[in-house]
């Protein structure tokens, strides 16, 4: 049991998937230990029932107990920032903070691990690696961000692929065997207390131990600056490795055929380049691995396509930054389109996106809260040649777009902003978009 035997009082901060995994873990390993569940907001009756009678502290009461150093150990869920004042106060009182991911590493010190992070591309890249390993006959599991908490993995595997968000790398204490960092753009600044700290928390994955093999992206200037002199590093989008050029994939100077790869866009080819770099390092044949992708299940809400009365609707709800929306637009370049933009305002710059829209204007843009008004105001002096409208919600956005769409057009939900405020997460936003669109045409195809 990695938690100190001297710990008499353990708190679990967060009652979501990772909190539930932590609760099961502590109860099975330390049934005699007092457990308290902390949560920032009130829990529903069903969520309370799932805690099985554990003591629960909510909101200010939880913060007060933390600041007072009431607990010996706190297992923190990823959504809780380690930079919050109550965390700093608790640490000064000797409270030990850990996480489900850290506990898993401590339980599995000899595991072969492939940890994947990046502002964008981590889900697709980790899924590709996992798929290709399994298709090659290797025993591999996939855990982490947005999926199965690592600690719920009860049996050892030959390889464990971990998808890690910046919330999970920020307080990571254990280095993986292989680290993959796909991209680095400004994101999650409020949670991390600034963009530079966000960058450093992401880069931490490869800085814990120089013996970790790093696979990273030569085309990303921030990653180049961070790791140019790092030993034990393999680059993709590099002259000699797997690279993307002119919307095609190459291995060095030679084209690398990828007829079985089901994903569109140069950004997804970059994800494939990262995954192929990893599996080739592990001794697998890249061509055979690419062939195995014929039945790869595309992660949802990432350029997910469906048709409604001759209109191609694309759910790219995962696009929470303008760089991701740019990548989506380039994927469908040349097709008349309407675009749905807007969400939580994190102060991101849309300058490059505006420049692209000037060169390739849409029929119409629907701008959603909360930053839709800011985008509308920023567009006003640019005199761009397309119609735009501020809407109150996604339903109004879809209605406004369908009034202007013609057969053969594209309707793209790629908001360039997080979903919080109107939706629980980007998945809910994507599901709602599809339901609204299908209601326009009797089900789509």
Regions found by a protein language model. Give the residues of each.
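Residue-level signal for inorganic ion chemistry
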Residues: 26, 74, 97, 116, ...
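Short, conserved loop/helix-junction motifs that constitute active-site signature segments
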Residues: 30, 172-175, 205-210, 227-229, ...
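C-terminal helical cap/extension that packs against the catalytic core
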Residues: 46-48, 53, 351-409, 444-445
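Short, basic phosphate-binding NTP loop
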Residues: 2-29, 33-115, 294, 302, ...
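Nucleotide phosphate-binding/pyrophosphate-handling subdomain across enzymes
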Residues: 2-10, 21-25, 258-362
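Short internal beta-strands
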Residues: 35-40, 215-218, 338-341, 361-370
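Phosphate-binding loop of NTP-binding sites
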Residues: 27, 65-66, 78-218, 222-232, ...
